[in-house]
Amino acid sequence: MTLPANRTGVIAKKLGMTRFFDETGQHVPVTVLSLDGCQVTAQRTVEKDGYTALQLGAGAKKPKNTPNAMRGHFAKNSVEPKRIVAEFRVDEAALIEVGAEFTADHYVAGQKVDIQGITVGKGFAGAMKRWNFSGLRATHGVSVSHRSHGSTGQRQDPGRTFKGKKMAGHLGQETVTTLNVTVWKVDVERGLILVKGAVPGSEGSYVKVRDAIKKAAPADLPRPGAFRSAGEAPAQAAAETPAEETSAATTEEGEG
C-alpha cells in the first residue's frame, strides 16, 4: 500500500476569536485565521539542499524594510517581499511551483490540524502564576513569603540548585504547538480558516498550520494542495477591476 505524499502546511495570520452555534444550539468558540498572501517562495530539493521542503512566505512587507539578501532572494524567485518566512518538510511528490498562492480550501471542515505559534508574553511572573505553585502557609510562622516558591536546593550535598528548577522568571513568549485542533469551517472567497478553540499567539501574529501528525488525514484532502498558480493571481486581480474604472482610466490617459 502506497501512503499519500506528505503535504505542506501554511502560514496564517491570527485575526481573533468569535463564536458560532451548531445544529444543537451549542455555542462553539472559534479562532479566525487568515491566509495573508501565503505563497511558495522557494523549493528545497535533495539534489541541491540534501532534503525536500517548501519555503513559504506570508504578509506584505515594504522592499525598503527588507534586508538586501532577502530582497535579492525574493526577486530571484519573482515574488513580493514577505513579512514572515518558514519551511515545511514535504515529500518530493508534494512539491509546488514557486509563486503559487495557497487558498483556504487547502484544509477541509472537520479535519484535525496542528497549529504552532508564539504565546503571548506576560513578563516576569512569580512561581504561583508561572508554575501553579500553592505558595507557603498563611500563618504559623510564615511572614512576607506567602507567595514565594520555597526551597530551591537540598543540603550540603549536592549543595547547588539544579538547572531547570521551577522558579520565578519570564512567562510566555515561547513557541508552543497545539495538537489536533478541529477545522470548523473554511471561507475560500475571503481566505479564512476557522478552527475550534484557541491557538497560541496574540491577535495579528502569524502561526504555522499543518496536517495533524497523530490523526489520519481525510481522504478528500487536495493533493499536493489547494493553490492558485503564479500566473493566475495577477489575471484574477485584473478581472476584479470594474469595467467603468478601466474605461475612465483609459479616457484620462487619452486626454492627457
UniProtKB/Swiss-Prot annotation:
InterPro entries reported in the protein's UniProt record: Ribosomal_uL3, Ribosomal_uL3_bac/org-type, Transl_B-barrel_sf
Lineage: Bacteria, Pseudomonadati, Pseudomonadota, Alphaproteobacteria, Caulobacterales
Transmembrane domains' residue ranges: none
Coiled coil: none
Name assigned to this protein: Large ribosomal subunit protein uL3
Modified residues (N5-methylglutamine): Q156
Pfam families recorded: Ribosomal_L3
GO biological process, one term: translation
Cytoplasm as UniProt keyword: no
Subunit structure: Part of the 50S ribosomal subunit. Forms a cluster with proteins L14 and L19.
PTM description: Methylated by PrmB.
Keyword rRNA-binding annotated: yes
Sequence similarity: Belongs to the universal ribosomal protein uL3 family.
This protein's GO CC annotations: cytosolic large ribosomal subunit
GO MF assignments: rRNA binding; structural constituent of ribosome
